[in-house]
Every structure is written in C-alpha cells, then in structure tokens.
Amino acid sequence: MAGRWTSLVDEAAAPWLPRGGLGSAIARHDFRRLRAVAAVSLTALPIVPLALTLALPVSAALPAGAALWASASLLAAAAAIAGGREFPTDGEVEFAPAPELPDLNAAYDLFAGLVTVHDTRGHVLSVHGRDASEYLKLMRDPHGRGFIEQIHVSDRIAFLRAIDSLRLDSERSAVDIRLERTSADGPQFAHIYCEMTPLRDAEGNLLAIVAQSRDVSEEARLQAEAAAKAAHAESANDAKTRFLAAVSHELRTPLNAILGFSDVLAGEYFGKLENDRQREYVSLIHQSGTHLLSVVNTMLDMSKIEAGRYELLLEPFRVAEAIAACEAMLSHQAREKGVRLTSRVTRSVGEINADQRAFQQILINLIGNAIKFTDRGGLVTVDAALEGNMLKLTVSDTGIGIAADKLQMLGQPFVQIQNDYTRRYEGTGLGLSLVKGLAELHGGDVSIRSAEGEGTVIVVTIPSDASGAAERQCADAPVTVEFPPRLKQHADGKREAGVPALSEALHTGEIGREGGHGAAQAKTA
C-alpha cells in the first residue's frame, strides 16, 4: 500500500520540482524525505479514526482521528526536513557549487570578433575571439559587470532582455548595442551586433551564455547617411511641391486674363478687327495661352499626385459618353493634322464607377499625343472593353512609334523621347506621367507596346467598380502654400474666363483665378 501511495505522490509532485539550478538538489532531497512521510501518513489515514472508535463514540472519534492524523503528519514532515539539513555554524556561509562548463576556449579563440562567456546574470566570465585584442584596445576590462557597464544606457534593457529570452529556453538571441569606446579617436560609441547562444546541461538548465560581438559601426554610419539623404530628398520634394503649387497659382491669374481678353478681341465685342493679320495674332495669343494653361494645370495635378493629395471623386458615368466628349474636343485638332480619329466601344461597356474628370484627362492626353505624333493620313483609334471587372482602354496610332531602348524612359516627368521628329513638337513630357499617376490612383496600370516607324499602342486598365481605388490617408500635415492677397480673392468661387465673366471683371478690375476653356483642357502637355 505504501509503495502505491509513493508512486502517486511522485506523479503529482513531478511538475512542481525545479529542473535544476540554484537550490534544486536541496529541494529534491527534501522531497524524498517528505515522500516517505506522506506514504506512511496516507496509509495511516483510515486506521487512526477506526482505532479511536474503540474508546469514543463514532461521532467524536472520526473528527478527533482526522485532527490527530493531520497533526502527526505535519510534525513528521517538519522533523524529516529538519533532520536532513546541516546548518552552517557561525562564520560559515553556504554557496551553490559553480557549474562545470565544457572546455571550449580553444574553439572560442578561432571565432571572428569578440567572444565573451557570460553567466546567467550577464556577467563576463572569460574573453576570447580572434580579434579580441583589437576590441580590448577600445574598451575597458569587460570582466564581471564591466561589459554591461560599458553599454549605452539606452541599450542595456535590450541586452538584458536578450539574456532573459535565453533563460526562457530560447536557442538564440541577438541584439544591437552601442559600446562605449575609451579611445579618444573616432566616435564615442561603437555600434556592436551581439549574437548570443546558450550553454545548457543535459537536463536543459542554462549554465552560461556565449556572446559573439561584431563591430558594425561602418554599416551603421552608411545607414545613417542613407537615412539623412532620404530625409533631404523628401524635404527637397516637399519644397518642389510647394514651389509648383505657388508658381502654378501665380501663373493662372494672368493666363486667365490673357485668354479672356483674347476671346473679347476675337469676338470683336469692342470693335471690329481691321485685317486678317490682327485676327491671326489674336488667335496665336489665345492658342499660346491655352497651351500654357494646360501645362500649368498638368504640373499642378502632378504635384498633387506625387504628394498623395489628389482626391478622386468617384461617380457613375457612361464610358461611351465620356469617350465621345473627348473625341469631340480633339476632332478639330485631328482634322487640322489630317489624321482620322475613330472610337469603338463594345456593347458590354455601360457605366463604370470612377473619377470622370481623371478618366477624361487620361483620354485627352493619350489621344492628343497620338494625334501629335501621327503623320497626315494616319489613324488614331480608341477602344473600350470589359475584361471581368476591369475596363480596358486602348489608344493606338499609326504614328512614328518608339524605339525599344527608349520605352523604359516613358512615363517619367519632364522626359521626352528626342529625335528629329519630336523636336518639332512642343511639350513637357508630363502627359504620360500624369496618365500613369491617375491610373494607379484608381488601382489600375498602364502598358505600352511600340515599334519605331509602325506606331504605338497604349493600354490603360482600371477597375470598373472602383474596387481598386487607392485609399490615401495623409498622415503628414498638408502642404500649405501662402498666396499673395490678390490670389485669395476668389479662392472659393470658380469663374469661366469667357465674355460674361470678363464683363464683370472689366467693371471690378478683378479676374478669377480658376478660369479655363474646353480647348485648354484639350491641349496636352
């Protein structure tokens, strides 16, 4: 019976016994003595109350027997523990024996960098490593707490956490620390990458920690320089955005006046033009102003896209109607060039949910460029079709085409493919860049196929249900541009630069800053 109780006690107590380390041997010794007492006590548990029933009534014998059994068991347990301990006499102190570590010093000396062996508290027991002498020239004696005390105060917690992870049965730990340098030359701290490996006994108890430290100061310096350059580039980009926004708004006011007054002159509202040369000059003024306003608007849109502040206004509209509107705006340009402009929209294409203004900007830029770089007698075709939930918009032409080695340059702001043909045409190289930006904002993309002398095919795909529209959450503060007082007068009201608006402007002396014409929107960059 006692043997059975002993095995049951072993099974119940095993999870609570320490696996090793300080005090584990004492705990196991005490447990063996308590186990013997428990086996005898559990065997005597039913006997003591039954024996008392011979002298006492049952109602009194059972509680009295249980109390007597419990008291006797506790006394026996205390006596067993006290009898098995040897207490130190005055002046004597007990120390747990130091764990025996495997002799791997010869191997440690072959490792690169600085190798330190630490106890479970992080104190250094020994120093090794192929480059140990070089490291020791730059630091104080690392033995004991010397290593920890030379770590930058902000990094000590991370170092101790790495050691704690090894105590919790982790098989590897690594940490970046800054180690104080004693040398007057160079920076105050060296950046160190410290990789730690535990040494355990057969039962898995942590005996020591081997740390291999490597100086990564040069890598840290390069990373800091890269971060500084990135911050400088971001600052320069922000300054560019501010500059473009300010300059664009500064240009819009005089441009609207130029366009409006050229309309007044061409309409002969204040007197007839005397000859054809005057009419030609007025037309040139209007065309040049329209083109410049288009460039300004495109630059402003590009700056918004790059800054992540171009807000899409998603709404349902019919693709066929949007294409027809763009085709009507550009038909005059195509007729003057002698280029045939056609469009084909499949029956399955009805309404889509997207930003109609951005959609038409994409079309106007692509069709305008196709007309511009197609010779007389050529053909420009616009196709629209649905592929799943994606709208596929294709603009193809029979123009000059693009060499294969130049295709990768397309879509970069202010970059144009230069040859004898393209030099005859004005432009900023912003058109295709704007197309790519607007397509990506919708969650779409742009692809280009072209061969020199054969023409170009540009395919734009965007989701028809706005499912891929980018969610732009501007964490940074918006770019604020302070405009001169005259540009603030009509900040909330948009006016057309046509004759009615000019009639009021001529009386008030003010011109709205947001004026524009359909023709201005039709010109491409």
Curated annotation (Swiss-Prot):
Q: How does it sit in the membrane?
A: Multi-pass membrane protein
Instruction: Name the GO cellular-component terms.
Output: plasma membrane
Q: Which GO terms describe its molecular function?
A: ATP binding; phosphorelay sensor kinase activity
Keyword presence, Isomerase: no
UniProt keyword terms in alphabetical order: ATP-binding, Cell membrane, Kinase, Membrane, Nucleotide-binding, Phosphoprotein, Transferase, Transmembrane, Transmembrane helix, Two-component regulatory system
Concerning InterPro entries, the annotation shows: HATPase_C_sf (IPR036890), His_kinase_dom (IPR005467), HisK_dim/P_dom (IPR003661), HisK_dim/P_sf (IPR036097), PAS-assoc_C (IPR000700), Sensor_HK_Regulatory (IPR050736), Sig_transdc_His_kin-like_C (IPR004358)
Q: Which SUPFAM superfamilies match?
A: ATPase domain of HSP90 chaperone/DNA topoisomerase II/histidine kinase (SSF55874), Homodimeric domain of signal transducing histidine kinase (SSF47384)
Kindly list the positions at which Phosphohistidine occurs in this protein.
Answer: H249
Q: Which Gene3D superfamilies did the record assign? A: 1.10.287.130, Histidine kinase-like ATPase, C-terminal domain, PAS domain
> Where exactly are the transmembrane stretches of this chain?
36-56, 61-81
**Subcellular location(s) per record:** Cell membrane
Q: What is its main location?
A: membrane
The residues covered by the Histidine kinase domain are: 246-466
Q: What is its EC number?
A: 2.7.13.3
Task: Give the residue ranges for region: Disordered.
Answer: 506-525
Question: Does the UniProt entry include the keyword Phosphoprotein?
Answer: yes
So what does this thing catalyse?
Answer: ATP + protein L-histidine = ADP + protein N-phospho-L-histidine
Please report the stretch or stretches of sequence annotated as the PAC domain: 173-228
Top-level lineage group: Bacteria
Q: What is this protein called?
A: Uncharacterized sensor-like histidine kinase R01002
Q: What is the lineage of its organism?
A: Bacteria, Pseudomonadati, Pseudomonadota, Alphaproteobacteria, Hyphomicrobiales
